[in-house]
Amino acid sequence: MARVLVVTTVYPSSPEINLDELVEKIKSKLPSDYEITRYDKVPIAFGLNALKLYVIIPEESEGGTSKLEEILQSVEGVEEIEVEAVHRISEY
């Protein structure tokens, strides 16, 4: 079964947000068939960092990335998200 890799940037609502804790909050909200395979902290400006998330989702996800986007937006501490890339991967 093919899966989809979604690369997103998550912008926190404040520079004081602990990004490691934010990732844990996000993981706790994701369905069991969604998986964060990697995340990086990306400097933005003036001490503000964003998270670059690499999330594997099922290819059959209805609505493409919209469900993932809704979940990410619902997490406390997330100001904005941006989907950067979507790739189909055959094996994972």
Swiss-Prot record:
GO terms for molecular function: translation elongation factor activity. Coiled coil: none annotated. InterPro entries: eEF-1beta-like_sf, EF1B_bsu/dsu_GNE, Transl_elong_EF1B/ribsomal_bS6, Transl_elong_EF1B_B_arc. Promotes the exchange of GDP for GTP in EF-1-alpha/GDP, thus allowing the regeneration of EF-1-alpha/GTP that could then be used to form the ternary complex EF-1-alpha/GTP/AAtRNA. It holds the Pfam family EF1_GNE. Belongs to the EF-1-beta/EF-1-delta family. The lineage of its organism: Archaea, Thermoproteota, Thermoprotei, Desulfurococcales, Pyrodictiaceae. Keywords: Elongation factor, Protein biosynthesis. This is Elongation factor 1-beta.
